[in-house]
Amino acid sequence: MVRITCTISFSTDDEPVGRSRQGSFDDHYKRVVWSKDGEQGKYQEEGDDPDAYDGPEDEEAPDISLATFFGGCSLHGANHVFVEDKKFSIRQGLWALVFLLAISMFLLQVVDRVIYYLQYDYVTLLDERNAKNMTFPAITLCNYNTFRRSQLSYSDLLFMGPLLGYEDNMAPGIPLAPEPDRQGSRFSLAEFFNRTRHRMDDMLLECNFAGKECGAEHWREIFTRYGKCYTFNSGQDGRPLLITTKGGMGNGLEIMLDIQQDEYLPVWGETDETTFEAGIKVQIHTQDEPPFIDQLGFGVAPGFQTFVSCQEQRLTYLPPPWGDCKATPIDSDFFNTYSITACRIDCETRYLVENCNCRMVHMPGDAPYCTPEQYKECADPALDFLVERDNDYCVCETPCNMTRYGKELSFVRIPSKASAKYLAKKYNKTEQYISDNIMVLDIFFEALNYETIEQKKAYELAGLLGDIGGQMGLFIGASILTILELFDYLYEVIKFKLCRCAKKKHQRSNNNERGAVLSLDDVKRHAPCDNLRTPSTYPANMLPHHPGQGNFEDFTC
């Protein structure tokens, strides 16, 4: 016995006439699920796994309309512009105009604040602070006369003639010293500087610091452009740094010096090493900063007592883009701490080594010392050119933190007529010698305080954000949480769009894998058996009252 099952669909009267069967079939569909025993089961949407079916309906799509969002958003005014289920009215138009005006004013203020922030302005703050004690600065001094005449020999004049302006046909005009024992070695410029220098033991007559006696052993030798010089409280001789606990005269350094004018060289000619001055040059600096006394020192004359009242100044500068200070460590083979003087000495040394293949005696490094001829022909002119004209080679930026000392100088005549005889007798000199050679130098802190000069950012990022937040609240009544709401809304919209696109792709993929599917409504509308006609004759393979159909229609009928 042959069992034939036929599914007949019935069309309703309100079915659109002429609707394409294939179109109705493709628009909406649900799969007919058959159980294993052959009985009809449940319907479910295409693309779902029959074994994982949980219910008859899909998850409800989120409401992402602007009206719904702005109705619950904290952004003021937008809920009057975007109104749900209501046509655009004049009231909404006025609110939209006011809302756009507020947005424009807010953006204008934001642009103005951002432009001001990008100018990177700064202000300078000046303050004075007291201290219980203060570190005394380093004091470097040099005699204006570099070489002592009593130490010059005839060979010294021959070698050093180009540097001193002496020529072979000139009479020395001074008694010459015996030839030094060089033990077969060649003439050495460093040895000559050391042998002919003014000695601190001979120059220093009296020395006191804060009422305590000091001596030549407290002064460290150092080379500068003036030859051999001496630094007090250098911090590099194994001694602790000196501390002062009081301000005013008598609480600092007080020294009496003999500048030894009778040892000054005669002027044979004008060179860079020739001096016309008598006295000493002094520089007050920190222990971390090498002396640059030829450009930063001040002169002290004999026959006067000079009072130098100091005030420590601590300066703080801003790095780019607000300022132009140097915040990175120094890139030098000679110095560990960056300072303008360290940068200048390092740069001048490299410049001379590159252009003259030698270095001056006061310059660091291991390059050979320049000969007197190289001094005259190359080193001195190159250094003068570098200092006076070439501003591009040695560009030394200001360090972001530095200490300098402000100075106020005052003078009194010394010796008085009453004290001249006493001093002449005390030091076994004539009164004229005392008047021409003796000087007294007092260096002290004016008060036990220091001055701070600090650059501060005129407008920082926190101020910019605060101004933007204030303008945002003033014009549109928004806050940072409002911005988060906007981002959350955009996230939901993008997620919904992406998920819908992914679902469509998944549905198309399932259609291709599983074949055609059919919903109940489509089955009714499609009506594959509605073309039944009265047959006259039937082929052997065709059932009665069934015209020829497609594969799927044959299956359903």
Curated annotation (Swiss-Prot):
Residues 46-57 have a biased composition (Acidic residues). Forms voltage-independent, pH-gated trimeric sodium channels that act as postsynaptic excitatory receptors in the nervous system, playing a crucial role in regulating synaptic plasticity, learning, and memory. Upon extracellular pH drop this channel elicits transient, fast activating, and completely desensitizing inward currents. Displays high selectivity for sodium ions but can also permit the permeation of other cations. The keyword Transcription does not apply. It holds the Pfam family ASC. Residues 36-57 are annotated as: Disordered. The second transmembrane domain (TM2) is a discontinuous alpha-helix disrupted by the GAS motif, which forms the selectivity filter by adopting an extended, belt-like conformation aligned approximately parallel to the membrane plane. This peptide belt encircles the waist of the channel and divides TM2 into two discontinuous helical segments. The distal helical segment of TM2 interacts with the cytoplasmic portion of the first transmembrane domain (TM1) from a neighboring subunit, contributing to the structural and functional integrity of the channel. Its main location: membrane. It is a multi-pass membrane protein. A motif (GAS motif) lies at residues 477-479. The chain crosses the membrane at residues 99-115, 461-491. Homotrimer. Heterotrimer; with other ASIC proteins producing channel with different properties. Belongs to the amiloride-sensitive sodium channel (TC 1.A.6) family. ASIC1 subfamily. Glycans are attached at N133, N194, N401, N428. The record marks D390 as: Involved in proton-dependent gating. It comes from the Eukaryota. One of its GO terms (cellular component) is dendrite. GO terms for biological process: cellular response to pH; sodium ion transmembrane transport. GO terms for molecular function: ligand-gated sodium channel activity; pH-gated monoatomic ion channel activity. Coiled coil: none annotated. Residues 1-98, 492-557 are cytoplasmic. Residues 36-45 have a biased composition (Basic and acidic residues). The record marks E128 as: Involved in channel desensitization. Residues 116-460 are extracellular. This is Acid-sensing ion channel 1B. The keyword Nucleotide-binding does not apply. Expressed in central nervous system.
